[in-house]
């Protein structure tokens, strides 16, 4: 039968304790979630500023749909680039300090547009080993284009420099997450940027988990490290995490963005997002810009969680961000701990291989500005009870 090999692989996934299943939420994304009639404190989403359920954003989204219709009808380069898209791109450029941006339907598509478009035969890509899956796929596409691809040990700047120094490639592209999605740690961007300058390389930064959260006004990891909007940087940010809506952008120089517009396949051959999404994101951007209190509360809750879990036998990785990984190790043990928390009204997902390396199954605790001091205290108490 044609499906036999699929059933065999599915059985292997199940026997390894790696079967994934979707949870159907009966309430909007927010601090609380209702699943199968159970009310839960939500520590699973990437809604870092609590904007996904923001009523003002929702009203702008609805008004935008009434004014601009339900869909864009085409790709950006045919007839799908409407006024709200153009306005949003200009506002993101101003906010991030770059001359120009392009918007995409997802961060995955944005990442697929950048590295494979920049890198071809005779070029070289240098990528952190813990980069997001979308960056890994982008790297593979660059390899298919003829580029040489090397992966350096996680955040190992010395190893990266050795690779750059030994390379004779015509063009060099360094690719890294800014905040690593499963560990929550930061890339040493000032050191990596210095290497990009020294070896005349592009620096592609995925700031999916930094945009809106880090920096003096939420502008992201570059602001956090006080780095310039350099012409050699291409910055990707997602708009469905801290921004609370959906989509992504790539920011860069006028020339680099024009090049992506002309040659980026995942930009050219994708229908543009509904214009109402762009309307909602313009409102979200305003709330991020004015969101100092939200970010301050988020950092307070992160500090409270880390202080409260400091004595646990399980290792809490050294993350300064909203992503707080608690290493359990064994796949089944991680799932069992997640289930026990669920039974106590706390939704904390277990993350297992292949998303993370074997032997490092973990709880991925996502902290939000919407969480209260009491919420964090409840989670700490439950983990101490179960540890």
Swiss-Prot record:
Its cofactor is pyridoxal 5'-phosphate. InterPro entries: Aminotransferase_I/II_large, AON_synthase_class-II, AONS_Archaea/Proteobacteria, AONS_Proteobacteria, PyrdxlP-dep_Trfase, PyrdxlP-dep_Trfase_major, PyrdxlP-dep_Trfase_small. The keyword Repeat does not apply. The modification N6-(pyridoxal phosphate)lysine is found at residue 241. GO terms for biological process: biotin biosynthetic process. Its EC number is 2.3.1.47. It catalyses: 6-carboxyhexanoyl-[ACP] + L-alanine + H(+) = (8S)-8-amino-7-oxononanoate + holo-[ACP] + CO2. It holds the Pfam family Aminotran_1_2. Keywords: Biotin biosynthesis, Pyridoxal phosphate, Transferase. Catalyzes the decarboxylative condensation of pimeloyl-[acyl-carrier protein] and L-alanine to produce 8-amino-7-oxononanoate (AON), [acyl-carrier protein], and carbon dioxide. Homodimer. Belongs to the class-II pyridoxal-phosphate-dependent aminotransferase family. BioF subfamily. This is 8-amino-7-oxononanoate synthase.
């Amino acid at each position: 039968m044609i499906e036999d090999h699929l059933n065999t692989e599915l059985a292997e996934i199940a026997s390894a304790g790696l079967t994934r299943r979707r949870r159907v939420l009966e309430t909007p994304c927010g601090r609380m979630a209702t699943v199968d009639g159970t009310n839960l404190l939500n520590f699973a989403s990437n809604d870092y500023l609590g904007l996904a359920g923001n009523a003002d954003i929702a009203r702008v989204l609805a008004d935008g749909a009434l004014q601009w219709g339900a869909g864009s009808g085409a790709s950006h380069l045919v007839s799908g680039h409407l006024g709200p898209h153009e306005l949003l791109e200009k506002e993101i450029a101003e906010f991030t300090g770059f001359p120009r941006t392009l918007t995409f339907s997802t961060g995955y598509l944005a990442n697929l547009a950048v590295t494979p478009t920049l890198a071809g035969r005779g070029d070289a890509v240098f990528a952190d080993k813990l980069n997001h899956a979308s960056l890994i796929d982008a790297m593979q596409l660059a390899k298919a284009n003829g580029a040489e691809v090397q992966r350096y040990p996680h955040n190992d700047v010395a190893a990266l420099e050795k690779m750059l120094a030994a390379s004779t490639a015509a063009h060099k592209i360094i690719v890294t997450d800014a905040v690593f999605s499963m560990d929550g740690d930061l890339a040493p961007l000032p050191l990596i940027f210095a290497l990009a300058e020294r070896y005349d390389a592009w620096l592609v930064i995925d700031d999916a988990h930094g945009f809106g959260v880090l920096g003096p006004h939420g502008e992201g990891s570059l602001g956090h490290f006080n780095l310039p909007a350099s012409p050699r940087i291409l910055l990707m940010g997602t708009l469905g995490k801290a921004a609370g809506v959906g989509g992504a952008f790539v920011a860069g120089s006028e020339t680099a963005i024009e090049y992506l517009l002309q040659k980026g396949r995942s930009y050219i051959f994708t229908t543009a997002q509904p214009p109402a999404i762009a309307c909602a994101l313009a409102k979200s951007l305003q709330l991020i810009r004015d969101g100092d209190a939200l970010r301050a509360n988020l950092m307070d809750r992160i500090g409270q969680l880390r202080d409260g879990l400091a004595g646990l036998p399980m290792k809490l990785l050294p993350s300064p961000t909203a992503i707080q990984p608690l290493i359990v190790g064994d796949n089944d043990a991680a799932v069992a701990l997640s289930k026990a928390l669920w039974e106590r009204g706390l939704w904390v997902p277990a993350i297992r291989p292949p998303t993370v390396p074997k032997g490092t199954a973990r709880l991925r605790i996502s902290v939000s500005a919407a969480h209260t001091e009491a919420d964090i205290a409840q989670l700490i108490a439950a983990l101490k009870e179960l540890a």
